[in-house]
Structures are given as structure tokens and as C-alpha cells.
Amino acid sequence: MTDNSQIKVIVGMSGGVDSSVSAYLLQQQGYQVEGLFMKNWEEDDTDEYCSASQDLADAKAVCDKLGMKLHTINFAAEYWDNVFEHFLEEYKAGRTPNPDILCNKEIKFKAFLEFAAEELGATYIATGHYVRRDDSTGHPRLLRGLDSNKDQSYFLYTLSEKQVGQSLFPVGDLEKPEVRRIAEQLDLITAKKKDSTGICFIGERKFKDFLAKFLPAQPGPIETVDGKVIGEHQGLMYHTLGQRKGLGIGGRKDATEEAWYVVDKEVERNTLVVAQGEHPRLYSDGLIASQLHWVDRTPIRAPRRCTVKTRYRQQDIPCLIQPIDDETIRVIFDEKQAAVTPGQSAVFYDGEVCLGGGIIEQRFSHPV
């Protein structure tokens, strides 16, 4: 067995079950394990939602139980500058960003990684992400998590080989029920804690109310694909392609019973376009992506077949990548896809291996 006793690993302790069990598993593997709790958002005293203090208490309880030291660090300024301001800019532009991906890139695998190495003397960091690292080719590769239902490689496509090589993912080889079982056997306070959802580090606030604090709403018309105005939206930023709930336009006399869906956001006209049922305008033959990141840092310079996900937990879509230049690619799906959303990420796979991805700039209904 490898002697890990001289290797220090800093685990990002979120106060959740996955990072708790990750810390325990690393201890079992003989590493010197310490925890780090990151505070990345400054709570407003008037804000009803405040989980950071509870999460910190849970992380501390777990570290005490496991006999681990817990460090704390405040990355709120870095989060605001490098993640949140970009998030607001994207919403202002009528796009739908994914801040969790940017948070992983800028905070967890940059600010945290650098702090752990430089200030705490760590060889590795570890997180509770459901992904795997594979070193069998001589280059660290990012693989999907074993539990396909919890796989989080979609959120980590911006990692470089170097970052993957400096990171450990102890629960990536486990299924979620097994992780909970381990936590229960250890009687950890986080064993039955529900998984967090909502924006990375901002949590489960009412999204509309939260966004309204930072961006003034701009009401505008809701139009059918035929140009008929049938209602008013409170702001394009509150809507995303494929959305059917919360439109407030049901039960119209001149329409069928079929559900209404958002099929487009026309930012220049501040207009939300809707249609009933499986309307062709909701579907795309492909997309253009930019701001590309390849895990091995090698641009794709020739057409390549692989699979793509255009949102988390989506089934793999067989596709063809056609490079336009080193920064931009055209992606053609084998079959039309619904609700391909500008601002979201397209993430590419070769079997179990996460190749990388980019930001969806536009979708198209005929190859462009």
C-alpha cells in the first residue's frame, strides 16, 4: 500500500455529506487531512436566507468528530469580482449563465487551490464532487463520476490537466446512497442533510427576489411566434428557453389547452416569444460555442465526433464538432435538441472522459 502519511490534503468542507465522507475516506487512505471552509458570500443582515453559519457549524462538527483541523477563509471579494459580476452581466444581456461552473473555475480550483498549496502546504486539495481522476495515460484525465445520476463533470470542464492532477475526488468512485451509508455509520451530523441546490454559494433564495436586488426589472411584451401580444413579462432575466411555468398566460379563449413554452428571448425588443406544445422554434440542429476550455489544453483543429451535454443531467447527445478557429466551434447534433440556451455551457465527452467545453453563443436550426 502507498504510504501517504507525509502527504497533506486540504478538503473543501462545505458542511454537506459529500465533503464530510471525502475527508473520512482520505483519512482511511493514510493522508494528513485538514479541512477548509470557504465563505464566499457576505450575508445581508436583513436577508432571511442565511445558511453559511449553519454550514460552518456542520463542517466544524464533522471535523471535530473526525479529529481534523478546520481552517476558514473568506473569498467573498474574489467571488464578487470573478463570478457574480459576470453572472449579472450575462443576465443583463438576456442570457442564462451557469455561475457554478465559473465558481469552480475561479474559486474552488483557483483561489482555494492556491491558498491550500501556498499558505497551508498542501500537496492536493480534495472536494466532494462526483467525478473521477484517471492517471493511467500519464496525463491526469477528468472522468465522469461512477454514479451517473450524480455525475458533476459538467460543472468541472474548465479544469486543466494540472488542476485535475492537484485534486482528489474521493466520492467519485461511489454511488450517493453508499456515501450516505458511510456518513450514517460514522454518525456524522451531515448524514441526512439534503443536497444543496440553487446558485453556488448563494443557495436557495427565491431567485426572482434575489435577482431583483441587483438588476432592475424591465417589463415587456409576451408575444406568440405569430407576433400577437398575449401578455407582459416582468423581465427577460426571469425566463429561460423551454420554460412553461410562471408565464401567467394560461386559459386563453383563442388557444388550445396545450402548454405554453418560452421559445425565444428577443433582447433588442425586450420581448418574450412563446408557443404552444412542441413548436419547431424550440428545437435546434446545433450550436456555436466560444470561450473554449479543453482539459488537455489542446484545441480541436479537425472535425471530431463525440457527445455533448448542453445542460446538467441531460442525456449525451451524439454530435460532430467543426472547429471555426481555436476559440470557436460549430456543433451539429445527430438529432434536433430542445431548449439549447445561450449563456449555458456545452460540455463534450469521449466515453467516460470529459474533454472540455465552451459557452453557447447561439443556436441554429439549419447548419450555418
Swiss-Prot record:
ATP binds at residues 12-19, 38, 128. GO terms for biological process: tRNA wobble position uridine thiolation. One of its GO terms (molecular function) is ATP binding. It is an enzyme of class 2 (transferase). The record marks 129, 344 as: Interaction with tRNA. Residues 98-100 are annotated as: Interaction with target base in tRNA. Its EC number is 2.8.1.13. It catalyses: S-sulfanyl-L-cysteinyl-[protein] + uridine(34) in tRNA + AH2 + ATP = 2-thiouridine(34) in tRNA + L-cysteinyl-[protein] + A + AMP + diphosphate + H(+). It is found in: Cytoplasm. Disulfide bonds join 103-200. GO terms for cellular component: cytoplasm. Residues 150-152, 311-312 are annotated as: Interaction with tRNA. Keywords: ATP-binding, Cytoplasm, Disulfide bond, Nucleotide-binding, RNA-binding, Transferase, tRNA processing, tRNA-binding. CDD domains: MnmA_TRMU-like. The active site is at 103 (nucleophile), 200 (cysteine persulfide intermediate). Catalyzes the 2-thiolation of uridine at the wobble position (U34) of tRNA, leading to the formation of s(2)U34. Belongs to the MnmA/TRMU family. This is tRNA-specific 2-thiouridylase MnmA. It comes from Aeromonas salmonicida (strain A449).
